[in-house]
Amino acid sequence: MSELFPRRIETDRLTMLPSTPEVLSPLDFYRVCSADPDIDEVTEHLTWEPHAHPKETLEFLRATSEGLESGDDAAYQVYVDPGDAPEGVDGPSPGGPYADSDLVLAGGAGMGVDWDRRTGTLGTWLRKPFWGRGYSGERAAAFVALAFDRLDLEVVAVEHVAGNENSRRAIETYVERFGGWKEGALRNWAFEEGEPVTQHRYSIAREEYEDADVEVAVEFHG
């Protein structure tokens, strides 16, 4: 993977590892992306739908791996310690260089980087048992620090489609925490099930991040 992005990101409760076929078995990930309880609800407002077959999952992981290698997409899988996992959720765990770990997959996180615009755009998803635990904000804080402190970007942006109230609440909380604000609504900007929908956009500028002076508990390894 690109030397621009860390090989491991750690916060108080989360461990984020590169989204590659070497780290997460495509077959294990397929079982999450195709048949996890509530997967239809989880993907309702995402850019991907439940996977139809294992090859789709392999192609998904190869695409995120290529984004990491090119330096254009910091794509990670989000894990928690087994003691923090909800009852009944016991995997999957990472493999490859992390095969000795018993971490439990909670979801995914990433930041697409537009180097010409010095802008990183955040994205995330979580398996439903992990909703409502503040993980989205904790993950966001780590990526905001990654954008400004390591990658020297000038703006961090995040968007959600109209009607995604869970994302709206989480985004408004952490954007305000870092001094950012809502830029506005982009009508018919995104698509859901082939239909145009309104997209709401928020951003944090470097100056706002520095003025907010928020201490972010995160460690970047590699």
PLM features: residue spans?
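GNAT-family acyltransferases
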Residues: 1-132, 146, 150, 156, ...
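Glycine-centered recognition micro-motifs in short, flexible terminal segments and loops
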Residues: 132-138
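Short helix immediately C-terminal to the catalytic nucleophile in hydrolase catalytic domains
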Residues: 140, 167-171
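Conserved beta-strand edge residues that scaffold enzyme active sites
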Residues: 161-162, 185, 189
